[in-house]
């Protein structure tokens, strides 16, 4: 009867269990994505809201967010943002980190196609704004979009968060 041997085996099991928990704590969601709007996708029935960016709404209580271009002409920036994200994904496999959940129960994530950060591309193209209240992760991309007057920055628009508050039923 060897107590030291039993203790050593138990210690190995504990190390193995800790390793498994550590791997599960950094979960990734990988698969084909269905685009809901410019900052939300669904992979394997998991609704993922991009963290760090906010896109105009394509459908919010029956309404689509509009913006004004450089000539003051109204355009459906919400639908344009959804279209842009669909183009970026282009039926490729998407990989998202699981960053927890928002207050609506959606999984928050940073999502990639290959090495391309989808949120960074959406902000850089002016089809989303950096969610600076939560993170400065995409501030450089937003500054670039403003400088070149990309997407929404070509004219005037309400920040998506403000637009949602004004258009809630």
Region roles according to the model:
Residues 1-9:
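Short, Lys/Arg-enriched N-terminal segments with co-localized hydrophobic residues
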Residues 5-6, 19-21:
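Short non-domain terminal segments
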Residues 11-14, 21-169:
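Small beta-barrel nucleic-acid-binding modules, primarily SNase/OB-fold domains
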């Amino acid at each position: 009867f060897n107590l030291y041997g039993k203790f050593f085996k138990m210690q190995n099991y504990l190390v193995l269990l800790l390793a498994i928990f550590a791997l599960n704590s950094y979960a990734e969601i990988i698969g084909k994505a269905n685009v809901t709007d410019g900052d939300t996708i669904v992979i394997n029935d998991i609704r993922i809201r991009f963290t760090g960016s906010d896109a105009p709404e394509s459908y919010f209580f029956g309404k689509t967010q509009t913006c004004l271009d450089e000539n003051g002409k109204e355009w459906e920036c919400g639908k344009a943002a959804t279209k842009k994200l669909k183009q970026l994904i282009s039926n490729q496999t998407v990989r998202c980190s699981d960053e927890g959940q928002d207050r609506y129960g959606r999984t928050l994530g940073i999502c990639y196609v290959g090495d391309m950060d989808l949120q960074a591309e959406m902000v850089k193209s002016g089809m989303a704004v950096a969610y600076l209240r939560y993170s400065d992760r995409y501030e450089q991309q937003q500054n670039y979009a403003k400088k070149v007057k990309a997407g929404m920055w070509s004219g005037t628009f309400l920040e998506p968060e403000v637009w949602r508050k004004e258009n809630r039923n």
